[in-house]
Amino acid sequence: PFGHAGEAALTDMMGTPFHHNEQSLRVVDKLERDGDGLNLTYEVRMAILGHTGSRIPETLEGQVVRTSDRIAYINHDIDDAIRAGILSESDIPREIADVLGSSHSARINTLVENMIANTQNTGVLSMQPEVAAAMDSLRSFMFDRVYTNPVAKGEESKAKDIMRKLFDYYYTHPDKLPEDFIPQLDFDGISRTICDYIAGMTDKYAIYKYSEIFIPTAWQVR
């Protein structure tokens, strides 16, 4: 949960780097089907592992997933920033909007359709240079205006605090883990088991569990 803030929190608590792509591969290889894994193909597994980070996917399937992930998260992050009042559509530089479009759907259509058309023309998974440059500029803009924004950073510290408190709670109360995770304690240890459980939460579920554990239930007024 909580994107890169959650990754950073789990890294601190585990004492080793936590990467969500590696965790996703762990889920399908080792955790699903009661530890038997899903027996996925090499291509699918490498697409999961290579969708982010410095590792460039070896397969076309992996390259499609990696590019699709970038298209998705940039545009969803714009929507989140607009809802949070950090950004408005009019803040996006005109030179970027002129190439990609000035709405969520327009940007995604431009990027996806251009990638398909240019790949068909060149035989290499790619976008036209102008569109690729606009996407890179949009990503840089998001780092300048959103990812390092003090408001966003403030929310990030709250998210990390939720993660740490959940981790500490389950570390001292492992019996409170879901029943499915109890057997895992014997062969993966307490920290790894808690990490797997928390890493599988959504933002909303992490907040719900935090509230359930740490926020007193209000007295019902009669």
Where do the protein language model's features map onto the residues?
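Histidine-centered, transition-metal-coordinating active-site segments
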Residues: 18-222
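Aspartate-rich (DDxxD/NDxxD/DxxxD) Mg2+/diphosphate-binding motifs
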Residues: 1-15, 21
